[in-house]
Amino acid sequence: MSEVKTKNPQRLRPIVPLIHREGLSMAKLGELCNPKVERGGIPYRIRTGDCMMADMAEMARAAGYKFVWHWEDVRPVEPTARLVRPVTSFKSDLLKPVMDYLALKNISLPDLGKKLGLSGSAIGYRIRNGVCMMSQMEEMADAAGYKFVWDWEELPEVV
């Protein structure tokens, strides 16, 4: 598995021109976000290149965009011998597609967790609750033979 850097200042750089294109400052974007995304935290997130997936979705929403992501298949991996029991109840749908990507390659949560030095239940917790850092999403995708790809899509104009 390739090493994924938690601090990758380039990871979130693509959103900076989008924020400015909407005439927003980092402080103004923070004011438009829900209270969990504090104003001073946005420059920090961009500087370190990491944030929670849910925070990324909230920042996109506040700037008038939609946060979208997918995993691109980049290499085969050994399927697991275990029964793949999917996560079936979700507190957040944000990471729900991860289960579909894992099922395509017949990868169980315990085996994915083992590749990352975590338990299957820790991976299941991330997916079920939608609590995952962007860097953790990259690591999970890489361990499963995928590449994590994300973007902010423009929302259609409301007439």
Identify the role of each PLM range:
Residues 26, 37-40, 67, 109, ...:
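The DNA-contacting recognition helix of HTH DNA-binding domains
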Residues 28-33, 108-113:
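Short alpha-helical "recognition helix" segments of helix-turn-helix
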Residues 22, 33-36, 63, 105, ...:
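Core residues of bacterial helix-turn-helix
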Residues 54-69, 135-151:
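DNA major-groove recognition helix of helix-turn-helix/homeodomain DNA-binding modules
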Residues 34-51, 117-132:
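Recognition helix of helix-turn-helix/homeodomain-like DNA-binding domains
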